[in-house]
């Protein structure tokens, strides 16, 4: 048979355990945030340009998204900090290129605006040093070994030997490399 003091002690320990778990859960949430609102910017340290870092080292990008707001009939542009940006971006050397691409000293990225903010996808096989946009084309980029259409590598197209066919407006119509012809859509 247990007495009241033992039950109270068990309840106190259970309550302490619950509070400890709650604190740990909050720490995890704070360390793995998908986004922070602008009012929470004091939790971040500005690195350079649009990039910020949290105390645990998570990289955030300051961006905008269009959101529905209660009582407003149209979408409202809201500024926030996106924590879903690739964590290996080098903010000190990151630069947006013409079109939907960007690069830093280590990698190249597909980088385009969406209604939810900037979409940033690392192009795993891209060589950052030789990566560049095809002149006047926001969808196409090349490095020394690959041709990219957005995030897709165009197979069997050699960027060193390809011929670019454009229409009267300067838009790419075809890429020809050896026996391979890529027809743009």
What are the language-model segments listed below?
Residues 2, 9-185:
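Non-catalytic tandem-repeat scaffold regions and their flanking low-complexity/translocation tails
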């Amino acid at each position: 048979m247990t007495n009241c003091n033992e039950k109270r002690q068990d309840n106190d320990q259970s309550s302490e355990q619950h509070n400890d778990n709650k604190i740990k859960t909050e720490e995890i949430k704070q360390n793995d945030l998908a986004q922070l609102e602008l009012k929470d910017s004091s939790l971040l340290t500005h690195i350079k340009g649009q990039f910020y870092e949290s105390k645990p080292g998570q990289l955030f990008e300051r961006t905008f998204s269009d959101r529905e707001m209660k009582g407003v009939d149209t979408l409202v542009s809201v500024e926030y900090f996106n924590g879903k940006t690739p964590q290996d971006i080098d903010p000190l050397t990151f630069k947006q290129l013409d079109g939907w691409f960007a690069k830093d000293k280590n990698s190249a990225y597909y980088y385009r605006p969406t209604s939810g903010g900037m979409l940033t996808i690392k192009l795993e096989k891209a060589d950052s040093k030789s990566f560049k946009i095809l002149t006047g084309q926001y969808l196409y980029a090349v490095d020394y070994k690959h041709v990219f259409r957005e995030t897709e590598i165009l197979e069997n197209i050699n960027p060193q030997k390809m011929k670019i066919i454009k229409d009267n407006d300067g838009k790419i119509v075809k890429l020809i490399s050896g026996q391979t012809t890529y027809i743009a859509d």
